[in-house]
From Swiss-Prot:
GO terms for biological process, alphabetical: tRNA modification
Annotated protein name in UniProt: tRNA dimethylallyltransferase
Site feature location: Interaction with substrate tRNA: S96
Pfam families: IPPT
Species for this entry: Acholeplasma laidlawii (strain PG-8A)
Keyword Nucleotide-binding listed: yes
Keywords carried by this UniProt record: ATP-binding, Magnesium, Nucleotide-binding, Transferase, tRNA processing
Amino acid sequence: MKKVVCIVGPTGSGKTALSVKLAKSLGAEIINGDSVSIYKKLDIGSAKITTDEMDGVKHHLISHVALDEPYTVYNFQQDVRTLIDQIDKPFIVGGSGLYVKSALYNYEFEQQDNVEFPNINEMIEVIRKADPDIEIDLNNPRRIESAYRTIISGQKRSNKTKKNEPLYDIYLIYLDMDRKILKKRLETRLDLMIEKGFIEETKALINYDLNIIGYREIKDYLNGMNDLDTAKEKIITATMRFAKRQKTWFINQMKPKVYNALSPDLLDECLKDIKEFIGV
């Protein structure tokens, strides 16, 4: 199995800076695992890495698609898998859990073709005849429709590898941080973003439907729905809630090795562990 290093954690935990130092030391390349930084024009508000911050390390899927271009988790999955095959030492860095897991594990996305469904009993009969070994909740119509769609496409559902089976040999680093400290860091970072032109960036994108933390609240401010202090408070509250969900998701779904993001020995600890993992 191809070895892949993955660095995840909440927004503001220091993933970007750590990943660049590690990649530079190991001759690795970084694949962006943040679903917002994939888009062009979303620069300041996404805390997108700059060319200077890359420090010569090759990055992929940064400003990859236009803001009005459809780009799904399936597109991300296919792009990342292609890159993993091409890169000698691939790192994936970001906090978008489903995106990261879909690329590294055997997620299979159902085709969204128009399918005419018979009644439930007829679908169950077709499923049972075509795939006697299937395990499915027959009291769940959506599950039945999904299995039926798969059967008529010519593929047995029971032969599908479960989505919790990894396709690669993964070393997963989760950067953890005390929530009070994280909140302070986020507040400082938000002030810096505004100094850099976050409000102006959002104003230039005002006609886009941006349901993204930060852009959404600044857009409301620009539309006169609240003042700037209220917008900032809402951004921090939403970001902290998101960080809590991120931690729960990664710990439960991907079982990472948890590191203290504020440890003075963090770089040395990660470097040592990754070297052991990749065998250098």
